[in-house]
A protein has these predicted regions:
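Short acidic, S/G/P-rich loop/turn micro-motifs used as interaction or catalytic elements
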Residues: 48-49, 179-182, 238-244
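Ordered, small/hydrophobic-rich secondary-structure cores
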Residues: 2-3, 24, 28-115
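Short amphipathic alpha-helices in soluble, non-transmembrane regions
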Residues: 185-192, 245-260
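Short, hydrophobic/proline-enriched secondary-structure or compact coil segments at domain edges
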Residues: 39-45, 172-174, 230-239
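Short, intrinsically disordered low-complexity segments
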Residues: 70-115, 119-120, 126, 196-253, ...
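Conserved short beta-strand edge segments in small beta-sheet-based binding/regulatory domains
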Residues: 257-273
């Protein structure tokens, strides 16, 4: 079976989603930098064999612009294949923008995708008989088919002017596919010290949190989007101009994304509204 046929078979397999154990201690965003730079997922096996090994793993990374917005998404997967050469693991790395898109758009496939840590991906890779998971520099060499995003100008969400005492105001949205459980909401509320939103009559904003870093004020809303997705809307009110601003924003966006992945959601894109 060649890699192209194998991608189709992996995509069509029946859903089976075991409960993920990816539950590290929550941390306040901005207080530490996540260690791995890539996002990892386990593809679970078919429903007919729930106790068997995972079907494969996925490594992904957003392509980011200077301001932290996503212009594309790179990904590669390792899955089992029939007919591998003697002595080699019966699997291979492959890259497919179509599969990357389907992980987010197809509910059946999404039900078989579990967000995991780098450590758990390493364990799954060994369980698949593939040996030690390559380092992230090597994994990036397997990214051959980028999923491109629309490069249109930012939308406007809220007033464009910075509040008094700040020189710039930016609004970002991290969009996620998947369902957030009640337990997940409790975990996020505790980790982010969120307060309930009392000024959203439509009930779309579940909670709000904020943090101050080096004179910059960051606040974010956890929001339901259309009843089918979730987002974290980050507002950055920037104090004195600094060459470090871009790095601080990208780090915070990364930490917010990681926290949502811990609760089983899959990041779709990072947009800027102002």
């Amino acid at each position: 079976m060649d890699a192209e046929t194998h991608r189709s078979e992996t995509y069509r397999s029946e859903p089976n989603l075991p409960e993920t154990t990816y539950r590290p201690e929550p941390a306040r965003p901005g207080m530490r930098t996540p260690e791995p730079e890539l996002d990892y997922y386990v593809i679970t096996g078919e429903a007919a064999a729930p106790a068997g090994p995972p079907a494969g793993i996925v490594a992904e990374e957003f392509v980011l612009s200077d301001d932290g917005t996503a212009t594309g998404l790179n990904g590669a997967a390792w899955t089992r294949m029939d007919g591998a050469a003697g002595g080699a693991p019966d699997g291979a790395w492959w890259s497919s923008a179509e599969f990357t898109r389907a992980m987010r758009a197809d509910p059946e496939l999404r039900g078989r995708i579990v967000a995991v840590s780098r450590h758990e991906a390493e364990a799954a890779y060994r369980r698949l008989g593939a040996g030690e998971l390559p380092g992230e520099a090597t994994l990036r060499t397997y990214f051959h088919d980028t999923l491109p995003f629309d490069g249109s100008a930012p939308l406007r969400l809220g007033p464009p002017d910075a509040p008094e005492g700040f020189h710039d105001r930016r609004v970002y949205r991290i969009l996620f596919a998947g369902d957030l459980s009640e337990t997940g909401l409790v975990n996020l509320s505790a980790g982010w010290r969120m307060r309930a939103a009392d000024d959203d009559a439509r009930g779309r904003v579940v909670g709000t949190a904020h943090i101050t870093l080096a004179g910059d004020l960051f606040s974010w809303d956890l929001r339901r989007v259309g009843g089918m997705a979730w987002s974290v809307d980050l507002t950055a009110c920037l104090g004195e101009p600094s060459p470090r601003t871009g790095g601080v924003i990208r780090r915070l966006l990364r930490e917010l994304t990681t926290a949502m992945r811990r609760e089983g959601l899959i990041p779709v894109t990072i947009e800027r509204f102002s």
